């Protein structure tokens, strides 16, 4: 049975941990507000750019642009994985790494078996996980979210598109956490390249009569790199917001668990103290009776 001193030490340790988790929750909440605002602000631009491409692609033969071209055989795949730099965010990293692993070993098992899967990892956690397991890493971006910059998104998008244009890969897939709400980030695995020109209904509804100068094909050539960079940037912002939400929830849960543990320890402490007092009183009474006897 634990002594009073042991229980006091545990209570002190739990209180210290509770203070840390509570502070981390508050920091994550402040960061979440900023990250959420940035992610939400990026969505309309990315969405409208995608709509504009759908509208333009209805006016031209998209097969003339290699970024629209679907390869007859997919032999080489580039997987872009976005994780966090730090832990203490619940299952945020574990779940997205599992999805990336599943994407590689199930969706592209044949390509992986022939050495046809390479990766770009944004975020320390994913980078370290796959580096330790000797996956083919084209580029890693550890500690990228400590100072999140559009230049990194641009570099990743340009690297992926150049690899696709040179025929080094036949498909580019991005795996990330999309921010939906504080309680429920959504795991996503999407094809980034080749770019889909939109389904028939989207083309029909992309609407109206527009005049394009100099011509739709030339505009598409300019917009495609912007579209890819914007999508990668949006994905990184979404992941950052989802990370802060996951960390805030994890620290809130840890704080509540510490509170419950303190309650249990205090009960144990009071019981042990009461037992010690009872024992002392019994010894005093026994001693008094022995003297009187």
From Swiss-Prot:
Pfam families: ATP-synt (PF00231). It is found in: Cell inner membrane. It comes from the Bacteria. The keyword Zinc does not apply. It is a peripheral membrane protein. PROSITE patterns: ATPASE_GAMMA. Keywords: ATP synthesis, Cell inner membrane, Cell membrane, CF(1), Hydrogen ion transport, Ion transport, Membrane, Transport. GO terms for molecular function: ATP binding; proton-transporting ATP synthase activity, rotational mechanism. GO terms for biological process: proton motive force-driven plasma membrane ATP synthesis. InterPro entries: ATP_synth_F1_ATPase_gsu, ATP_synth_F1_gsu, ATP_synth_F1_gsu_CS. Transmembrane segments: none annotated. One of its GO terms (cellular component) is plasma membrane. F-type ATPases have 2 components, CF(1) - the catalytic core - and CF(0) - the membrane proton channel. CF(1) has five subunits: alpha(3), beta(3), gamma(1), delta(1), epsilon(1). CF(0) has three main subunits: a, b and c. Produces ATP from ADP in the presence of a proton gradient across the membrane. The gamma chain is believed to be important in regulating ATPase activity and the flow of protons through the CF(0) complex. Belongs to the ATPase gamma chain family. NCBIfam families: ATPsyn_F1gamma (TIGR01146), PRK13425.1 (NF009958). This is ATP synthase gamma chain. It comes from Chlorobium chlorochromatii (strain CaD3).
């Amino acid at each position: 049975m634990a002594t009073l001193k042991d229980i006091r030490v545990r209570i002190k340790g739990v209180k210290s941990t509770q203070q840390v988790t509570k502070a981390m929750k508050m920091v994550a909440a402040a960061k979440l507000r900023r990250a959420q605002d940035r992610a939400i602000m990026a969505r309309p631009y990315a969405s409208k750019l995608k709509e504009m491409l759908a509208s333009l692609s209805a006016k031209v033969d998209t097969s003339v642009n290699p970024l629209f071209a679907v390869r007859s055989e997919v032999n080489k795949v580039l997987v872009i994985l976005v994780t966090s730099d730090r832990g203490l965010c619940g299952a945020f990293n574990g779940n997205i790494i599992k999805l990336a692993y599943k994407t590689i070993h199930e969706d592209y098992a044949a390509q992986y078996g022939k050495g046809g899967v390479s990766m770009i990892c944004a975020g320390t956690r994913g980078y370290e996980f796959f580096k330790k397991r000797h996956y083919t890493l084209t580029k890693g971006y550890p500690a990228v979210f400590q100072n999140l910059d559009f230049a990194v998104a641009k570099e990743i998008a340009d690297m992926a598109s150049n690899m696709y244009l040179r025929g080094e890969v036949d498909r580019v897939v991005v795996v990330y956490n999309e921010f939906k709400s504080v309680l429920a980030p959504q795991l996503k695995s999407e094809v980034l390249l080749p770019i889909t020109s939109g389904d028939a209904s989207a083309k029909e509804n992309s609407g109206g009569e527009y005049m394009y100068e100099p011509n739709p094909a030339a505009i598409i050539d300019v917009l495609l790199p912007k579209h890819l960079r914007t999508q990668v940037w949006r994905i990184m912002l979404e992941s950052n917001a989802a990370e802060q939400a996951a960390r805030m929830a994890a620290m809130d849960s840890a704080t509540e668990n510490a509170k419950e543990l303190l309650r249990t320890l205090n009960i144990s402490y009071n019981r042990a103290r009461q037992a010690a007092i009872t024992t002392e009183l019994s010894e005093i009474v026994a001693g008094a009776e022995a003297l009187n006897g």
